[in-house]
Amino acid sequence: MTVTLGMPAAPPRPVGTRRLSRQIHVGNVPVGGDAPVSIQSMCTTLTSDVNATLQQIAQLTAAGCQIVRVAVPSQDDADALPTIARKSPIPIIADIHFQPKYVFAAIDAGCAAVRVNPGNIKQFDDKVGEIARAAKAAGTPIRIGVNAGSLDKRLLEKYGKATPEALVESALWEASLFEEHDFRDIKISVKHNDPVIMIQAYRLLAQACDYPLHLGVTEAGPAFQGTVKSAVAFGALLSEGIGDTIRVSLSAPPIEEIKVASAILESLGLRERKLEIVSCPSCGRAQVDVYTLANEVSAGLEGMEVPLRVAVMGCVVNGPGEAREADLGVASGNGKGQIFVRGKVIKTVPEAQIVETLIEEAMRLAEQMEADGAASGSPSVSVA
């Protein structure tokens, strides 16, 4: 039987036209221009613990991280950079605060880029020329990372607090200092913990320069709160074409940041869709435990590398219609489930066999898609 699948192999076009920015390269990852929006995270290990750091980087890479940042608060951390930069499977960005000497150590170590915070590096403006020369000689991009929590005191006095205008002025001022030394291998971030202020700042920045922009809501909070803040801010900006690389900051294991970032990009059509569950909130009409069914189907399909859409429906109101719109689906009721493949009922099974049947059919469809040369992605599961 030939099955026509509902989900397109290519993602839908993003909502807005992409902002045209200059392109830089962070290691082998292009950032800006027409390059796809890339995903970043940051290690939570002590950088001086080389083995633990490399192990976490490997886990992040497997989850889909493309660029990773490591903290360099001490000489021991700086001493670990050459080994980490050499052995990491993805580009390393050294995160530098307070001590400009670590900027030069990171460049010498072969890091793919260096993040500097102009708000807290001692005599940063006086060091820009030396940093620019070293970075240019090594081909190392610089990220000017402005943060609301460490804004230059001069700007706080001028604006009274970390306003969007203050964040942007800080970033553009530091960029202009690098430009005076003919260095433009730059990307910029202007982070705030309030997504509304953050959105306003990036909109202003996008109009004022053509540097690639790294998006982030700083100190976003625990997993749930941070996910909501990041989704709101990134969704608004990326739908307007603003943003070239993103990091979801969560008070959670960094691998969770990658999952959220990937889901945000997929939801906007900026990355091929993978595992996606669309489920109803359940109600008194549901004739099946939707929560358990959705979780079991999701767990059973986790890791499948094809863009498959599966619908798991809990009642007869929207169930049949939603299931027909999916590549694979079930409409549940009266202790049984009708299994749909691309809108056609192929069998009816007892409720106890729904999960097993869906997983079996998903595997079969995945094999067919791979045989037909479909682009890889993960399954997309819809539950209601």
Curated annotation (Swiss-Prot):
Residues binding [4Fe-4S] cluster: C280, C283, C315, E322
**What pathway does the UniProt record associate with this protein?**
Isoprenoid biosynthesis; isopentenyl diphosphate biosynthesis via DXP pathway; isopentenyl diphosphate from 1-deoxy-D-xylulose 5-phosphate: step 5/6
* Keywords attached to this entry: 4Fe-4S, Iron, Iron-sulfur, Isoprene biosynthesis, Metal-binding, Oxidoreductase
InterPro entries tied to this protein? Dihydropteroate_synth-like_sf, IspG_bac, IspG_bac-typ, NO2/SO3_Rdtase_4Fe4S_sf
One GO MF term attached to the UniProt entry: 4-hydroxy-3-methylbut-2-en-1-yl diphosphate synthase activity (ferredoxin)
| UniProt family annotation | Belongs to the IspG family.
Q: Which HAMAP family match?
A: IspG
Catalysed reactions, as listed in the record: (2E)-4-hydroxy-3-methylbut-2-enyl diphosphate + oxidized [flavodoxin] + H2O + 2 H(+) = 2-C-methyl-D-erythritol 2,4-cyclic diphosphate + reduced [flavodoxin]
Which Gene3D superfamilies does the annotation name?
A: Dihydropteroate synthase-like (3.20.20.20), Sulfite Reductase Hemoprotein, domain 1 (3.30.413.10)
Q: Quick one: which gene encodes this?
A: ispG
Naturally occurring in which organism (per UniProt): Parafrankia sp. (strain EAN1pec)
* Signal peptide annotation: none
Among the record's GO biological process terms, what is one? terpenoid biosynthetic process
Q: Any binding details for the cofactor? A: Binds 1 [4Fe-4S] cluster.
Question: What is the protein name given in its UniProt record?
Answer: 4-hydroxy-3-methylbut-2-en-1-yl diphosphate synthase (flavodoxin)
Q: Which Pfam families match?
A: GcpE
| Function summary | Converts 2C-methyl-D-erythritol 2,4-cyclodiphosphate (ME-2,4cPP) into 1-hydroxy-2-methyl-2-(E)-butenyl 4-diphosphate.
What are the EC numbers?
1.17.7.3
Which cofactors, by name? Answer: [4Fe-4S] cluster
